[in-house]
Structure formats: C-alpha cells, structure tokens
Amino acid sequence: MLEKSNAALIEAIHAHTPQHSNPASLLMDMLNIGREAAYRRLRGEVPFTFGEASALCAWMHFSLDRVVGLAATDKLSFQLKFKEFTALLETYNEILERDIAFMREVASDPTTEFATATNSLPAEFYGKYDNLNRFKLFKWLYQHEVGNPAVRTFEELKLPAELRRNCREYVRWVQSVATTYLIFDDSNFKHWLNALRAYREMHLISQESVRVLRDELFAMLDEMETVAVKGEFENGNKIFLYLSDIDLESSYSYVTTSRHQAVNIGMFSLNGLRTPDPLMYEYVKKWIKTQSRFSTLISGSGELRRIHYFKRQREIVAQLG
C-alpha cells in the first residue's frame, strides 16, 4: 500500500511540474533537500514522508487524498484563503504572494485559460488602483471588526508599500495569462456606489476621499472600455468580456493549464474557497460556460450594448459628486 501510494505521488509530481522545469530541482527548493536525495525520492528508493507529501500538494496544487485514492466520491476538500482574521494586512499580503507565484507559473503556459463570473469588480482591474484597493480592505476590516482599532476611518488606514506593490504585481501576472474570460452583470459599479455612500454617511470616509475614489473608478472605466473595444489587454493577451443579462449571485472562477486545474468560489468579500478537485472544477467550469449563454460578448463586438453599458456605469459613478 505504501509503495503504491508513493508511486502515485511521484506520478502526480511529474504531472504537475511546469514545462521546462526539472522535478528534482523543484523538490530541492520545496523540501530543502540535496540533489541526490531528490532523485532517490523520484526513483522511489526513499519514500516521501507525510510532511513532504503535504508540502508538495500545497505548493503544486493537487489533492493528496485523490493521489493516494482515499478521496470519498461524495466529499470535496476546500482551502479557505483567510483562516486567521486577526492580522488581515499581513495575511492578505502573504496570499497575494502565493497567488502571484501561481499566476506567474500558469502564465508561462500558452494553453492557460482563466475564467471568472462575478457580481463585483475583479481584482485584475481595480488591483492597480491604490485607493480602490485601500477602500476594499478598509471595508473588509470594518465589516469583520478586525485589525488595528485605532484605524477608525478610511483616511487612517495606510497600506504597506510591499502590499501596494504586490497588488499591482498580481494584476500584471493575471493579465499575462494567454486567454481570459470575464462575465459580469450591471451591479458591479452600483455596489461601490452604495458602499461609498453608506460609509460617507457613517463618517467613516470624507467627501474628499470619495472624490478621489470616484476619479479612480472613472479611470478604471476608461481602461475597461479600451480593453473591451480591443478585446485584449495592453500586453496583447486576449480577453473575452461578457455582460450578463441576469444577476450573478456570487463569484466563481477557474484556471486550467496543460498541467493544472483549480477553482475558487468567492465569499466574505476578499475571502474564497479553493480546490484543485477535478469534479468541482468541471462543475464550476460548466456553470461559468452556462452563464455565458445568458450574456452578451462586448469585447471586440456588441458595440451598442458596450456603449450603453459604459455610459450607464459612468452615470452611476458620477452620482458620487
């Protein structure tokens, strides 16, 4: 049984090793072992310890239960992005660094496909705007009543330079994926309008800061419209933007490459449930593809719908004064 499980783990390591990478080199880096020790494990001469197997699953994004054949067919394992809620900024920065590493890896594969259906503005657009990022995090802090109690207003929240840099870096690598599909509905900018109005009325943000955020929302709209007209990001990678005719109840995404499959289900604003489970991947992918049938493609086509949509969103943002 041990030999069979170890052989299955070795097979999974080879299957999830990125193209043009050496599995032995990856083991040396991930497990902090020497070259000969890495090759002995890959040849099956030395079995992997449970700790080593667990670390490899986390780094290489595959399910240990499924590798060793222990996964129950009626149960799925998810990883919650945020498990600790007492140090949000530090935790969020660590998650960003892991996400950047993952997106950098999958972006190197020309077959990579990244798809999202969401009722909120995705980070691949707002993530490069410092104040929009800051408000998103401030709102999260306030809703969960965590973080520094001295940060009572938006203006008092200062994001570390490393976090701001990682937010922009994440956007860069997400947009480096070969093909992106994004489905959203009419409510995404309305959500920002409602939140900013509410926080302003509670004296949690000043009118001056609201105007700064308004200007960044306008700038993001200009960027999104340019992307929609061209059907590609500034770097030339393709993006298919769909406008849903029905309201989207939550946010779902999947990424697929020649070696990886993973999904994320959004929850609690910045949080999410993640899993590489192949069955859940098929469910989420099918759900997103189904949503596209109730949507209009506005990137590179659908000109009238696209013009009307962006005109309406600018009218919504203008209500911020």
List the predicted regions and their residue ranges:
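Charged, low-complexity, helix/coiled-coil-prone segments
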Residues: 1-5, 34-39, 112-115, 126-138, ...
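Basic, Lys/Arg-rich alpha-helical nucleic-acid-recognition elements, primarily the DNA-binding modules
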Residues: 1-79
